[in-house]
Structure formats: C-alpha cells, structure tokens
UniProtKB/Swiss-Prot annotation:
Alphabetical list of Gene3D superfamilies matching this protein: Aldolase class I
Pfam families named among the record's database cross-references: BATS, Radical_SAM
GO biological process: biotin biosynthetic process
Protein name: Biotin synthase
HAMAP family: BioB (MF_01694)
Lineage of the species this protein comes from: Bacteria, Pseudomonadati, Campylobacterota, Epsilonproteobacteria, Campylobacterales
Annotated catalysed reactions: (4R,5S)-dethiobiotin + (sulfur carrier)-SH + 2 reduced [2Fe-2S]-[ferredoxin] + 2 S-adenosyl-L-methionine = (sulfur carrier)-H + biotin + 2 5'-deoxyadenosine + 2 L-methionine + 2 oxidized [2Fe-2S]-[ferredoxin]
Binding site for [4Fe-4S] cluster: C17, C21, C24
Domain of life of the organism encoding this protein: Bacteria
Pathway assigned in UniProt: Cofactor biosynthesis; biotin biosynthesis; biotin from 7,8-diaminononanoate: step 2/2
Amino acid sequence: MKDIFLCSICNVSSGGCAEDCAYCTQSAKYRVDIEKYKQKSLENILEEARRARASGALGFCLVTAGRSLDSAKTAYISEAARSIKEAGLELHLIACCGSATKEALAELKKNGVDSYNHNLETAKSFFPKICTTHSWEERYETCESALEVGLGLCTGGIFGLGEGWSERLEFLHALQTLSPHSVPVNFYIPNPSLPLEVEALAQEEALECVRLAREYLPSARLMIAGGREKVFGQAQKPLFEAGINAVVLGDYLTTKGNRPSEDIAMIRSFGFEIAEACH
C-alpha cells in the first residue's frame, strides 16, 4: 500500500501577467474572469498554511504571477517562508515565482524555502506554439539553477495543449535529464477566453500520459494537479494505479478544487493512505 503525499497551493498574487502563455488564465493578454490582486497579506498566507496543514497537506506552495522572481518578490516570499517556518507547521515549503537567478534562489533557500517549482510545461519543440514572450530554455535554466543552489526541484507540465505523442516523449525526456524530486501533471481544460482551440483529453489518453511519466520518472513524486476533476470526475483510482503518488489538495491558482476532506476520503476509499511525513 502506498502513501499519497498532499500539497496545497497559495496564490500569493493573481493575474496581470505580461506573458502570453496560451494556456494561462493569469495572462493579461486574455480577458478571463478571474480574481485579480497584487499580494496577499502575510497574515492570510500564514492562515492558509495553517489550514493546509490541518487538512493533511505536507507541502505548501507559494505562487506569484508574472515572469520572474524579482527583488521585491524575493523579499516577500522569504518573509512569508520565515513566518511559516517559525510557526512550527512542519510544512515542506515550495516557491513558484517564475524565472529566477541563482542569487534569488539562494536567498529563498536561506529563508526556509525547501523546493522551487518551475514547470517546463511541454516539449522544447512545441513551446513556441503556446508562448512567444519567453523561451523554453529560460525555464530549463531556472530548473538547473534551483538544483545548483541546493533546492529541491519540482517541475512538470500540461498535457493536452495540442501536442502529439512525439512531443510528449520529448518533454518527458527533458524532465528526466533534470531528475526532479516532484513532477506536477496537469491536464489542460479548454477555456473559451483562451486562444488554444483543443478538446479536453479523454480519460484513456490522460492515463497513458501518466503511465509514460511514471516510466520515464520512476522515483519522482508524480503529483496530479489541474484537470483531474474535469477529466476523471470521481473515477480517479486509475490515476493512482498508473503511477500518481501525490495530489494537489484544495483549490488551484484560479479554479476551485474539491473540499480537502472529500479528496482524502476518496483516496482512502481506493485503499491508499495519506503520507504523514516528507521523505
């Protein structure tokens, strides 16, 4: 019986991003009806961290909108990380703040951040079809920098953007070269406000993506994230049988997730336990 690791997301800043990622509701290039705000207060962030830990999460990811981790974001995320660590919540802290220099990443690590999340999103060859304002190489270099300063690396991406199987294999091979500790797996859900004209993945195709990810990344924490509820509904057991061993608990960046208690009950009904320690 395997233990399922739970991670919660805190959307520290929302919307207004100048990048043109075709899958992203936070891009200012598209008219998407989402909640927009500059920055949550430290009190709100700490309260979300407490709720996440009480719900069973071991990971807590601090996410900011925008292309990169500038000096102001570095200082604020560092302050938030210190507050959470000082509260003794025993959470594995992840920061997700875009492209970053080694100096900024080292500062986060010094202040209590354990891992950095920066998704490759898709294959290098396919990336120009979904984003023109920055390069895939910039993403890969940030992942390398996170590893170089001693942070854990969390990097994955989105299936169902219009890519084919050859691009999926290329993407998974690129992830393999980074040996990430954690790999978020998302399924794109079509949104009429975004420019991508694709259909949602069928369940079997989505499952094959998970099986391949597990084959390429046998020791990674494979974390199912956005799109699982839309693609699978309550019939999610095959995801875990295909190799998923971690779940994003609660809400996502701009969309609602299931209630944490419902997801935990569902996971246990499949015969799995909830992880009680990071390892």
